[in-house]
Amino acid sequence: MDDDIYGNLLAMKYILMPIWALLVVTTIGAAQSNPFRQPTASELAAAVRVIRADARCPARPRFVAMSLAEPSKTLWLDSAKRKSIPREVRSTIIDPPAAKVYEFTVDVVNKIVTEVRAVPPVQWMLTESDYARADSIMRASPRFVDALLRRGVSIDSVAIETWASGVPDASVRLVRCLLYHVDARGLNRYDRPIEGVSALIDLASGTIIQWMESPIRQTPPASSLHDLTAAINDGAFSSATRPPTLVDGEVQWNAWRFTPMLAAREGLVIYNTRWVDGVTQRPIAHRMALSEMLVPYGDTSVTWTWRNAFDIGEYGFGMTSSSLRKGVDVPTSAVLLSASFVSEQGVVRSVPNAIAIFERDGGVAWRHTTNAQAIASQRRRELVVQHIATLANYDYLVSYIFSNDGTITVDIGLTGVMLVKAAADTAFDAREFGEQMLAHRITRSLLAPTHQHYFNLRLDLDIDGVDNVVTEVDVRSPLDQSENRFGNAMMMDQWDIRSEREGLRTADPRMSRTWRVSSTRPNHVGAATAFTVIPESTVYPLLALSHPLRRRARFIEYQCAITKYNADEMYAAGAYPNQSAGDEGLPKFVANDDRLVRRDVVLWCTIGTTHVGRSEDWPVMPVSNARLRLLPTGFHSQNPLIVPQQSAPIKSKKTK
C-alpha cells in the first residue's frame, strides 16, 4: 500500500514544537481528490435531480438520510486505483402509496444513477411528515379532546411529541405520542408533562389503535427551565491556540492526518486516520463512527414501559445537528465547518458550523523530578473534533480527541433536559417504595425515571495495514501457588480472538480487560505494533433476558465484538432498526463465523452510562461522559513526545 496518500509531503519534525503545533504541507492541485470529504450542497441538489429524473424513482418520492456513499475501501487501498473512486451519494427513497423502500446511489460528477436496490419490507427512520401526520391525527381524536377537558387543559396549550413505536412489526407504520404543556412562546420545555396519556397511531390508516391513560395527576408547575435562555451566552471563553491546517477536507495537525465528515444518520465520521512518522504515513483507522444507540427507560407505568429510542437508526444524529457557537460551545479559535442535508421533500438544507475543530491544553503530558532543582515536564496538546446532535430533550456532544502523545479518545457528552414524570404525590419517600423505586424525585412534583444510554462505536482499525490480530488481554493474580510463590504476581493472560463468534466479548473490570489490535509489522523490540482499545465507560443490560428490546439490540450484550470487514455491515442493530423484529445487525454479521487472525477486522465497542437522576441534573443536566480510548501499544519506540537526540540533558544545580 502506498503510504504517501496525497503526494510529496514536506519532511517534518513534529516533536518539541510550539504549543500550537501547526503543520505546513504542500498543496494539492486545484482538483479535489479526497473521496471522504463532506458532500456539498450542490452535490446533494444534483443527486436529488438525478434521482427524480430516473425512471425507477417513485412519482412522489420521499428522501431519507442522503449522505456520502461509502467510498470503496478496496479501491482506496490500491494507490493505482484511487483516482477511479467515483464521487457518490446514497439515499433511501420511499414510495408512500406503495409503502416501498429503495436505496438509490448517484454519481454526482457524471450525474447518473449507479445503483438501485429494492429493500425488503422495513420501516425507515421517522420523518417530518410522520410528525405532522401524527399531530393532526391526535388533535382530531375525540379521545384526545376528552382527556384534555377532564384535566382542564386547553388544546392550544399542548405540544404533541412523537416517538418511534418500538413495536416489532414492520408491516405497518406506527408511532407513539405523548403530551406536554407548552410555555408562553409555544415551546415544549419538557418540565410539564401531561402525565398518564399516550397513544399508538397507525399512520397509514390515520387511526389511533391503542389509547393508554392512567388516573389523572396534577400537572407540575413551570420550572426555572424557562429562564435558561437568559444565561445562554454566559461563560464565553477564548483560546490562545491556533487552528489546524485543512487541505481538501483533511485535517493536518502535529503528526495526525484524518478527514471529518458529517453523515445524515451517524453524525460525525472520522476517515483515514494516520500518524506521520518521518516521511511515512502509518494507517491507524480507516473509519470511526457511532453505529447505533439505545436508550431504554426503567419505569413500569403504562405510558413509560414502552419508552426506548434507537436515536441514530430511528431519528438520525447528523440530521439533528446543532450549530456550534464560538466563545460559548467551542473556543474562539475553533475552525467551524458547515454541513448540508436533504429534507424529506428533496430540499437541501445547510447547518452552519456543524463541526468544530480546535486545539486545547490537555494538562501535564509527562513530568519527572530528579531532585528538588531538576524538574522536567511537558504539556499535552489535544485536537478536538466535535459535533452536537439535539434529539428532543437530550443534547449529545460527540468528540474525537487526538493527543500529541498518540492517543485517540472518543468522548460522548450527555446534557440537555431529563425526561420527567409528574409525581402522584409531593411527599418524599425515604423508603423508596412505589414509583420512587424506579425514579428519583428531583422536585416535589417531578420524578426522573432511571434509564440507560448505550453507544455502539464501529471502529474499522487498520493498524499499520489491514492485516490485524485482535488479542484479549487480562491481568490477574495466579491462583496456582507455583506461579505465585510470594503472592505478589500479576500475570497477563493474552489470547488471540480467532473467529467472529469467538469475538463477542464482554468487559471484566476485575481483570482490567482490554483488547489489543496488532499489525503484522514488528516494532523495535520485535513485538507487533499495536493499539489497545479501552472502554472506560462500560454499561451492562438491566433489561430482562426475555425483553424483546434485547433481541432488537443485541449489541448491548457485548462491550466489544469483532467482525471481518464487510462494506455492507455498517449498523450494529441493522440498517432499519425502526420496528425491526430483532436479530439484525451483529447477529447476522457473525453468523458466518469468519476467521479473524491476520484479517481486516472491525471492532464494535459499546460504552454508555446508567443514569440515576439527581436534583442537580435539573432543570438542565451538567455534562456527563462516556469514553473509549485507543492507546498506542508498541506503535512507537518510546514516548512520542520525546526525541533523545534533540533533548539537552537535564541540568541540576549543585546544592551547598
Predicted feature residues:
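Exposed beta-strand-loop-beta-strand "reactive/processing" segments of non-cytosolic proteins
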Residues: 58-109, 155-203, 385
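Hydrophobic or amphipathic alpha-helical targeting/insertion segments
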Residues: 102-132, 136, 140
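Short, non-transmembrane alpha-helical segments in secretory-pathway proteins
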Residues: 36-77, 126-167
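Extended effector regions of multi-domain proteins
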Residues: 32, 113, 117-127, 183-407, ...
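Bacterial N-terminal signal peptides
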Residues: 17-27
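Bacterial N-terminal signal peptides that target proteins for export
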Residues: 9-19
